[in-house]
């Protein structure tokens, strides 16, 4: 499932960034299965922060209804020197526009799109107009 893969990818980035002293923050439309609140984790670094992030990600209810991610992105404001990484299999024009505005279309913005092997060409064509660096992660080609 692409949602579960997105969570796994997020976990890997959190661990990698924090191990290099880079603070991370999570903005998600995923809902905590216990609190029923959207998952949002303030910026931080260190082992306790990683543990808090992983705990929240593990409690994400992947079957619950969620708000559109572009709404959540629009509510946040990125700073001009902030590196942004969007991990989402959703590829809508509305999300692309919201992310471009949030990331201010800088070279510091990247969109990782988990997809299945047969969907790559169509995904690349669909999002070819997006000026943000977009990388497609083919699930069948990733090491587990």
Where would I find each of the regions flagged by the language model?
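Exposed, interaction-prone extracellular/peripheral surfaces
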Residues: 1-144
């Amino acid at each position: 499932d692409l949602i579960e893969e997105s969570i796994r990818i997020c976990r890997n980035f959190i661990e990698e960034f924090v191990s290099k002293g880079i603070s991370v923050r999570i903005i998600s439309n995923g809902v905590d299965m216990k609190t029923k609140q959207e998952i949002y984790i303030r910026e931080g670094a260190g082992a306790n922060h990683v543990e808090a992030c992983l705990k929240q990600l593990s409690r994400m209810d992947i079957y619950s209804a969620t708000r559109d991610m572009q709404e959540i992105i629009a509510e946040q404001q990125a700073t001009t020197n902030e590196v942004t990484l969007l991990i989402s299999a959703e590829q809508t024009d509305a999300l692309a526009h919201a992310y471009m505005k949030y990331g201010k279309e800088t070279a510091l913005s990247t969109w990782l799109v988990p997809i299945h092997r047969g969907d790559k060409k169509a995904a690349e064509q669909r999002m070819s107009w997006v000026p943000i660096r977009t990388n497609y992660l083919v699930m069948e080609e990733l090491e587990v």
